[in-house]
């Protein structure tokens, strides 16, 4: 029963993704006025991406599909911008989820996943090199290939072990209050929208990686079509 439910969640997420926002910096951009409707749309867009990621086997493939569907880059292909020379020891909980002892070597990889000029997520990744092929290890150590693409031959599946929202576009009590009057300001969006912690498994259900993915406001970097209800504001 789980796969049909996941497919329905993904289909619903991709349909909802058609509602759209705009640009980064400190405000979301001219396409995102700070209005009640805009906040409802932002909520739908963020939650649709969240649902698509939770239902997916590969965050890399999902983000590439998001970038392509929203025309965010001429070549919608994800690239991992590596932060080289950094290390972060795995916690005992991570080692337990990966089914490795305290002396088993783990490798750490921190990347920013970008589509064109848009950094869509930041990822901290701990993986067990002995459970990958030599070629996979070489690719991960020497190239900017996203992790999901590098290990795709393992028949990867994901199990989410934690999810945390970092932004709620609608104010507390919005469902019981009258909507505020629209204004000519732009919607302020924080740097980070939500994060997931997931364990990756081979096709034989052997855990080989744990990743913490934090999704940024750049996922909203696409053109939001004007709405009839948008306030008539002077051009900046």
PLM features: what roles do these ranges have?
Residues 11-21:
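Bacterial N-terminal signal peptides
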Residues 2-3, 16, 50, 77:
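Low-complexity, intrinsically disordered short peptide segments enriched in small/polar/basic residues
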Residues 2-12:
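Bacterial N-terminal signal peptides that target proteins for export
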Residues 26-108, 112-114, 118-179, 184-194, ...:
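N-terminal domain-onset segments
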Residues 6, 23-26:
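Intrinsically disordered, low-complexity segments enriched in proline/serine/threonine
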